[in-house]
Amino acid sequence: MGSNSTAIPTTSVAELKYLSLLARDYPTQAAAASAVISLEATAKLPKGTEHYISDLHGEDEAFIHLLNSASGVIREKVDLVLGENVPKAIRAELATLIYYPARKLPLLKARYPERFELEAWYRQTLLRLIDVCRFVSSKHTREYVRSCLPQGCGHIIDELLHAHFEDHNKTLYYGQIVGSIIANDRADAFIIRLCELIKRLAVDKLHIIGDLFDRGPRPDLILDRLMTHHNVDFQWGNHDVV
């Protein structure tokens, strides 16, 4: 009679070496499988936007505008999200608010001297910013988006980004969150943080291609800004040679 025994798979010395390294981060089969599932799912997400800027030549104001507007990407996202439901002038205004929230916000608020008018504008603006932020976050995993959330109010923004407004009970819940933000005089802070988050999520990586110095007045301000960017690479140009 033939043997019914099942052959036991063997592992080579080389395989054991790599398995032992893998086990440091993934000590169980379940942990390794979970990581594979997550990575395979992430690979199916759209590629993040990469922003290329060259020939800065010390022109700090022009550079800051390119950075804040992502060379038109932010306005494009605003138009895609709000579409024909919002007039073109209002969409342009919202895009400018995203570019320069601290500078633009006081100017927009000054149009509404009455408290009830200002509160209505706050609510509308917060909801529109949440819609834009939700759209630009769709290229990223929820874990990555959470890592970008500002401290202090990140959990509230996370709730609003994953709102399901088709659920009546949740609609009341999210409406109460926005109302509480306004009632507790936190609307300005949330607007500014949402604007910064939109800019952060809209561009995955920034590439600076040469010629930072020469001609312009403040290349140092450009360097200062680049030092705070979340993901940038840099190539020196011939004008940067001392």
Question: What do these predicted regions represent?
Answer:
Residues M1-V242:
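Feature recognizes metal-dependent phosphohydrolase scaffolds
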